[in-house]
């Protein structure tokens, strides 16, 4: 990756594999924005992953619970914590790397109008055997206390309507341009120019 900012659509990616790829890239100096974090997948059935998260929720400082560890419920923060664990975040280099990273639920402006990419080596369909169980991160987050799944879903529905309208307009415009260029190439002027060797 060697673009100013790369926007990754996290839908149907495996959490750990995507996190490792992003960690490597931000350490190399690449700015990355991750959208649709709630649509990430984790291998394994929902109930087992929920038990693992509840095991994590029990971990706390013995004498003062406010000192951490902090149990983030939002999908964006769960992904952030996975990436942070793969970066030496206490050094200046690690802090600078994490500042190059932004993670969002849904696709907020202005990233709804930017080109989004996927990470093939982290896609569930290419990495998980067909028929194996997997968990959606948004569902897991909601089960442990994340309150904004419905809000994000509502905003995503609105965005998809706008996106469909834009795509329909773009297709119509492309069709007009191609038909006009085809008509122009078949015109008498083009034939005359061809006769003169142009």
Curated annotation (Swiss-Prot):
Keyword match Zinc-finger: no
Name of the coding gene: RPL16B
Traced from the root, the source organism's taxonomic lineage reads: Eukaryota, Fungi, Dikarya, Ascomycota, Saccharomycotina
Q: Which PROSITE patterns match?
A: RIBOSOMAL_L13
N-acetylserine modifications at: 2
List localization entries.
Cytoplasm
Q: What else is known?
A: There are 2 genes for uL13 in yeast.
Record's family?
Belongs to the universal ribosomal protein uL13 family.
Look up the domain of life of the source: Eukaryota
The entry's protein name is Large ribosomal subunit protein uL13B
